[in-house]
């Protein structure tokens, strides 16, 4: 049997996402190219690895076995790469960082400073929501993650590096703008523009109100922070966002923060990686950079 690593890599991505389309997006391939790699793997093995249930693809019994071994092979290859990178030293190497979409408001500046100090290290930055970040940690397919609350269902190391205050935003002409000490009960009468399911900000927002016995009214749902802010500016509802995402809007008075009981909700950003993972010199250098530069970086962002 002649199975290629490329075939296994493509198969593993399809199996993780239960989708050829999402696998193609992750791997930066066309969907026909992904389908061809899976088909060639099935031909080599002599068994079907997926079956269709409606619009979703699911693993067959043979597919589940191949998925188990493909992940083990992938893990061994990543460990080999890390060992080889360690032999090169911190002046060289590659680094894959994944960040929550809200972190992306300061991540490029963070990466630029790090790149100036370590120009020989190649950086790849993935920006996605919390659900996808947890999947990346679970599959150990990323070196380091910058995110909000670390997952509980994956064994990870998590180190706080910056405050992440969540605030309630409204357009400047909203009736609650300028009011003091707004109660949560009063706020619950308003409609809220929501991030999508799987968003860390949405989960934090819903948890905050639930823990205080309040239910919020869901309005429009958006997959991007910029869309959420635009919807709030247009009067479609209030929202809860990270203070880091509205620096420009506050300066220009396009949005205002409301003085609400319990807000700002003081949270933190974390640097997260799989427990027991041997960090490459490049990953170790980035970790030390983030933790040591956090206070200075916070001042820049402020």
From Swiss-Prot:
Superkingdom to which the source organism belongs: Bacteria
Positions of the HTH lysR-type domain: 1-60
InterPro entries hit by this protein: LysR_subst-bd, Tscrpt_reg_HTH_LysR, WH-like_DNA-bd_sf, WH_DNA-bd_sf
Residue ranges the UniProt entry marks as DNA-binding: 20-39
Gene Ontology MF: a single term: DNA-binding transcription factor activity
Claim: Flavoprotein is one of the keywords in the record: no
Keywords: Activator, DNA-binding, Transcription, Transcription regulation
Protein family according to the UniProt entry: Belongs to the LysR transcriptional regulatory family.
Biological function: Trans-acting transcriptional regulator of RuBisCO genes (rbcAB) expression.
UniProt name for this protein: RuBisCO operon transcriptional regulator
């Amino acid at each position: 049997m002649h199975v290629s690593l490329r075939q296994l890599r493509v198969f593993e991505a399809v199996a993780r996402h239960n989708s050829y389309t999402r696998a193609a997006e992750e791997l930066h391939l066309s969907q026909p190219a992904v389908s061809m790699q899976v088909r060639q793997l099935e031909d080599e093995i002599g068994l079907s690895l997926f079956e269709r249930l409606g619009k979703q693809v699911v693993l067959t019994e043979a597919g589940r076995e191949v998925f188990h071994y493909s992940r083990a092979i992938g893990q061994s290859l990543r460990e080999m790469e890390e060992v080889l990178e360690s032999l090169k030293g911190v002046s060289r190497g590659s680094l894959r960082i994944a960040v929550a979409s809200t972190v992306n408001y300061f991540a490029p500046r963070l990466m630029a400073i790090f790149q100036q100090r370590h120009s020989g290290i190649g950086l790849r930055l993935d920006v996605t929501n919390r659900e996808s970040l947890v999947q990346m940690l679970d599959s150990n397919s990323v070196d380091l993650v910058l995110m909000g609350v670390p997952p509980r269902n994956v064994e990870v190391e998590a180190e706080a590096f910056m405050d992440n205050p969540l605030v309630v935003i409204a357009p400047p002409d909203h009736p609650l703008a300028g009011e003091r000490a707004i109660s949560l009960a009063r706020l619950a009468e308003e409609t809220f523009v929501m991030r999508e399911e799987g968003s860390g900000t949405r989960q934090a927002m819903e948890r905050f109100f639930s823990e205080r016995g309040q239910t919020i009214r869901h309005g429009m749902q958006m997959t991007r922070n910029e869309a959420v802010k635009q919807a709030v500016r247009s009067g479609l509802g209030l929202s809860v966002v990270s203070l880091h995402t509205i620096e420009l809007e506050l300066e220009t008075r396009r949005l205002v923060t409301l003085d609400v009981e319990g807000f700002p909700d003081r949270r933190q950003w974390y640097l997260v990686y799989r427990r027991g993972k041997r960090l490459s010199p490049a990953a170790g250098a980035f970790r030390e950079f983030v933790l040591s530069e956090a206070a200075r970086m916070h001042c820049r962002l402020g």
